[in-house]
């Protein structure tokens, strides 16, 4: 058994370190909601969002569209779960949330939070329906907070 531990140490030293993730340039954001049936920056729409595990699972959830990258939507996920109660745990996991209040995207008008640290790149076909538009001041505050990510 001691040899197995020694072998693991040797192998771990020989492994090449993973290359660092390339930082993407900050996305270009605009505020351009239009009641035209298309997902536009500034709108909260419902879309299928893959889980972070990348195993093919996900769920239909509200997202705030913050821009476009070619024919893909740039969006941030919303939730009605209050992360203020577990803020330390969320921060330790690298997740950052911001309160955005209630809106027409939630039929129960529950207060929502937007996740700032995970920019989603979604196919326009992933959008199921429009929910509502965030007002300009809240949109600008979300974008500023998103850009201040470390």
Protein language model annotation of sequence segments:
Residues 1-61, 65-150:
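Conserved functional hotspots at enzyme active or ligand-binding sites that engage polyanionic ligands
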């Amino acid at each position: 058994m001691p040899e197995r531990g020694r072998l693991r140490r040797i192998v771990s030293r020989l492994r090449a370190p993973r290359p660092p993730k390339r930082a993407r340039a900050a996305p270009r954001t605009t505020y351009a909601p239009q009641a035209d049936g298309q997902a536009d920056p500034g709108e909260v729409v419902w879309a299928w969002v893959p889980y972070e595990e990348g195993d093919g699972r996900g769920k239909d959830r509200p997202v705030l569209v913050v821009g476009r990258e070619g024919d893909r939507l740039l969006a941030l996920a919303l939730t009605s779960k209050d992360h203020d109660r577990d803020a330390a745990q969320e921060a330790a996991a690298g997740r950052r949330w911001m309160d955005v209040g209630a809106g027409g995207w939630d039929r129960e008008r529950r207060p929502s939070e937007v996740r700032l640290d995970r920019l989603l790149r979604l196919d326009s076909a992933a959008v199921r329906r429009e929910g509502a538009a965030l007002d300009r001041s809240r949109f600008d505050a979300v974008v500023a907070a998103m850009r201040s990510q470390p």
